[in-house]
Amino acid sequence: MNRTTLILFFIILSNTITVIHGYVRGCYYTNWAQYRDGEGKFLPGNIPNGLCTHILYAFAKVDELGDSKPFEWNDEDTEWSKGMYSAVTKLRETNPGLKVLLSYGGYNFGSAIFTGIAKSAQKTERFIKSAIAFLRKNNFDGFDLDWEYPVGVAEEHAKLVEAMKTAFVEEAKTSGKQRLLLTAAVSAGKGTIDGSYNVESLGKNFDLLFLMSYDLHGSWEKNVDLHGKLHPTKGEVSGIGIFNTEFAADYWASKGMPKEKIIIGIPMYAQGWTLDNPSETAIGAAASRPSSASKTNPAGGTASYWEICKYLKEGGKETVHQEGVGAYMVKGDQWYGYDNEETIRIKMKWLKEKGYGGAFIWALDFDDFTGKSCGKGPYPLLNAISSELEGESENPEITTEEPSITETEAYETDETEETSETEAYDTDETEETSETEATTYDTDETEGQECPERDGLFPHPTDCHLFIQCANNIAYVMQCPATTFFNDAIKVCDHMTNAPDTCI
């Protein structure tokens, strides 16, 4: 398709019109960012107008029976106030064409409940019916599945997704409404991809695939690296040649996912380390500890982009890595890897050349959303994405025309009540801010390890906090994040509350 030609296809399906638009610009909104103090506090009113084609509201949850539930006390409307669901979906009134999806799950939610649903026909049916009712009740345009990860249950996962798509189509026919969109956030790790996804089946049923091409490196490793880099780099120690955006996207495409459905993930935050030797700063430099606490992550190890801008003003030195396409900043013994405007523009040009469907960000509250930290106006990173992708139509994405919505009141921001469930979730978020790749990596101990099978994830023989990722019979010893262990039954790094007594 010629880049200068705008083609509109009108498909009559279920009494609705489906229109093909340009590149996707997806934006995750996190419902726990409301609890940050001061300049980090983020509410629906902070969401920009016109920069996102899709807003993904993170997160909702589901119980063991399969029933949909809100995560926060103020997600839904009450008799006395409008909730954050309404505040976010209301943005469509001033942004025609915007789609707002509800994202279910997330890293902290885990895999067990989704697995139980997928393995039970009765629970699957209940889950789908509940989800449709919940989405319609709260005026969402679709469902985003953030199941991290369906390792070992790829076929059950695929059948669940197929059943959801079928039900969404049938519901649109009977209701006369536009079909609910069905999307997913998925792993960029080869081992997880191989063990979790029937890609050919998913390619037929997902409307969009949000590739979490970040957190490929982090402070769980003992060497610094760019966690969302585009290409492999010299000096990389773990995931050599495969822990990069290009490999992950191309691998999904090679396994049968249509390129126009693959949406490239761009982090709005940095992964950080404390250098062992501040004079050694190149990729691969030794760093045995996470970076210091930040305002967005008191546990350390990450920092938002707006915090990076402040560190730069305080004397940090930024280097753009041309080979890998990523940036890093060094300030004393603190090392942070991230994307800036320059590297994002390179990534956008790359994805257009490769034929991918667009980009998405994790997350809105990590960009300089106030414009006060970087001195470049609000949302410098998201604006870089939007300016490169807006108006393009090389790889269109299919959505349906806007439904009618009921007039709602403005979101009320003076609520102060907070439940114990919210407090627990917010604490979890400080441990893992990116809601993405559950497995994390350390390849210092690969020597001498053998692969039981050509590809897959396997327990470490002596340490429950490690596991072995095999790719083409090459063994990589990986390390789970702090306070987790490798659960071989579900093939993920799981919370220690589920660990056997022998795992200390």
From Swiss-Prot:
Domain named GH18: residues: 23-392
Domain of life, per lineage: Eukaryota
EC top class, as a word: hydrolase
Catalytic activity: Random endo-hydrolysis of N-acetyl-beta-D-glucosaminide (1->4)-beta-linkages in chitin and chitodextrins
EC number: 3.2.1.14
Cellular component GO terms, alphabetical: extracellular region
Active site (UniProt): 148 (proton donor)
Sequence repeat start-end pairs: 407-420, 421-434, 435-448
Note: Known to bind calcium.
Entry function: Microfilarial chitinase, which may function to degrade chitin-containing structures in the micro-filaria or in its mosquito vector during parasite development and transmission.
Protein name: Endochitinase
Origin species: Brugia malayi
